[in-house]
Design a protein with these regions (language model features):
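Elongated scaffolding segments in large macromolecular assemblies
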Residues: 124-125, 154, 456-460, 467
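Signature for the C-terminal beta-barrel architecture of outer-membrane proteins
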Residues: 363, 388-400, 404, 410-424
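Composition- and surface-driven signal marking solvent-exposed, interaction-prone regions
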Residues: 10-14, 27-30, 303-304, 382-386, ...
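Outer membrane beta-barrel transmembrane domains
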Residues: 342, 350, 357-358, 362-369, ...
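Hydrophilic extracytoplasmic domains
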Residues: 272, 297-299, 315, 326-329, ...
């Protein structure tokens, strides 16, 4: 921080109000000592796993360093939350929750990027002051009815946030905002032969974003309307579980982009039908699962249809209380997100450009994992080891053109692949009499892939060169 003599504080207030069939809880927290409260509201609502993921074109720059986060976060944060619950009986309840977070982060950053090219190595250094102001608000209403034969849950949410990042040295102001409203309905009916589950998700999101530079301003106005409706049947008998799930999913996704010299009205709306059978068998020391999701998807503006899949299997063997072994494998075919499908050229920061080049990226990934563990709670001794292999095959590859003033990524139609190996192990030993616990973690990884670079030859003509790379990493 620029002011080393700044007074540090951390404080919190809370209040609890109880009544017949209802209760209220209010919380307020504030600090400027580096403690991260950005996820405080998410933890209080507790249902972020049901949120529909959103893809944007601009994002605030992050920072990565081998330090604890509170040593990097020069902040001033205030967060306020109120929670009120009405409980009419043992089955039915209604919860209302509202929260607001105001956060200001100021940092002096230094960054070095090294690009290895066939004929040269380019190093780009930058040092700048960065100020990020964030205002985030959320509202949630949740109704639950949990009887012996039926479970009903309906959750309605409204979320909004404004993030404004500014760097004077870079001459860059980046603003990302979001306003979304969603409804999440879930019904489970229990029967003697099995159970039925019905889910319905509807969400609308508006995401305006802008990049202001000395040369001008780029604006992204993005609208997304998403719905997902499904029915599932689950049956368990004698250690064998089977589930069949079918549904329909659709999204209307549009973008209005300025400046208008690029495609300014982009539409990536799509509709899909999906089916997911799932099986699980447990016999003694063995447990195995098999899942085979299938999805038929149609992109209307692109006039493209796809069959996506994600089969996976899991096998676990528990030798005894101490030893457990497992094996996992999956194969997944997917398409790019909304920003990946945009066909034109757009700028993400003061020197970085991305060009979709009108291509439709797809990806097929296979993943395998081997895991083993030993535990002895009496002697407080634990050891785990995991080996993971992943390979991705893609139909497109970003070609990079790097100079000191600009970095341009252009998508090219070129089949390519990348693969990675990861080995991780943890050993832990505790000594109860000494109140001592020690642990050692080892992480070893290797990644291989392909890189496409645009270069100028001796005559000044531009050409593309495909290279392979390897990256090794060891941490203990």
């Amino acid at each position: 921080s620029d002011n080393n003599d700044k007074l540090l504080w951390e404080a919190g207030l809370n209040a609890l109000q109880l009544g017949k069939g209802k209760q209220s809880v209010y919380n307020y927290k504030t600090n400027n000592n580096g403690k991260d409260l950005s996820n405080e509201q998410t933890r209080l609502t507790g249902n972020n796993q049901q949120q529909v993921p959103l893809s944007g074109f601009l994002s605030q720059p992050g920072i990565s360093a081998p330090l604890d986060k509170n040593r990097l976060l020069f902040n001033e944060t205030h967060t306020l939350n109120g929670n009120r619950m009405y409980k009419w009986n043992d089955d039915r309840s209604l919860r209302l929750q509202a929260g607001y977070t105001h956060d200001i982060i100021q940092q002096q950053r230094g960054n070095t990027q090294i690009y290895y090219q066939p004929t040269d190595t380019i190093q780009i250094d930058e040092t700048y002051h960065y100020r990020l102001r964030s205002d985030i608000a959320n509202l949630e209403l949740r109704y639950e009815d949990n009887s012996s034969r039926n479970y009903i849950s309906n959750r309605f949410t409204v979320d909004g946030e404004i993030n404004r990042g500014r760097s004077e040295e870079l001459g860059q102001t980046l603003q990302t905002s979001q306003l979304s409203a969603g409804n999440y309905f879930n019904l489970i009916r229990n029967r003697e032969s099995g159970s039925w589950e019905f889910r319905s998700v509807t969400q609308y999101a508006y995401q305006p974003a802008s990049l202001l530079l000395e040369e001008g301003k780029s604006k992204f106005n993005q609208h997304n309307f998403y719905t997902d409706n499904s029915a599932a049947y689950l049956r368990k008998y004698n250690g064998f579980t089977q589930q069949y799930k079918a549904g329909i999913q659709g999204e209307q996704a549009t973008l209005k982009y300025t400046p208008t010299k690029q495609p300014n009205d982009f539409n990536a709306s799509h509709l899909s039908l999906y089916l997911t059978p799932y099986f699980q068998l447990e016999r003694g020391k063995w447990l195995t699962t098999l899942s085979f999701p299938l999805k038929a998807e149609r992109y209307f503006s692109q006039q493209r249809s796809f069959l996506f899949f994600n089969p996976s299997t899991y096998l676990r063997y528990k030798l005894d209380y101490h030893w457990t072994f497992s094996l996992y494998g999956s194969l997944k075919r997917s398409a790019g997100d909304f920003s990946d499908l945009y066909p034109g050229l757009y700028q993400t920061d003061y020197r970085t450009w991305r060009d979709g080049n009108g291509l439709f990226p797809t990806n097929t990934t296979q993943t395998y994992n081997l895991y083993g563990e030993y535990k002895n709670t009496v002697q407080e001794f634990f050891i785990t080891a995991a080996l993971t292999y992943s390979r991705s095959n893609r139909n497109t590859l970003f070609e990079q053109s790097v100079s000191e003033d600009a970095i341009v990524y252009t998508r090219r139609e070129l089949p390519n692949h990348s693969d990675s190996w990861n080995l991780s192990s943890t050993l832990s030993k505790g000594i109860y009499d000494w109140h001592l616990k020690t642990s050692l973690t080892l992480l070893l990884s290797r990644s291989n892939g392909e890189q496409l670079t645009r270069l100028a030859d001796s005559k000044g003509n531009q050409q593309s060169l495909l290279q392979t790379y390897r990256y090794d990493y060891l941490k203990a």
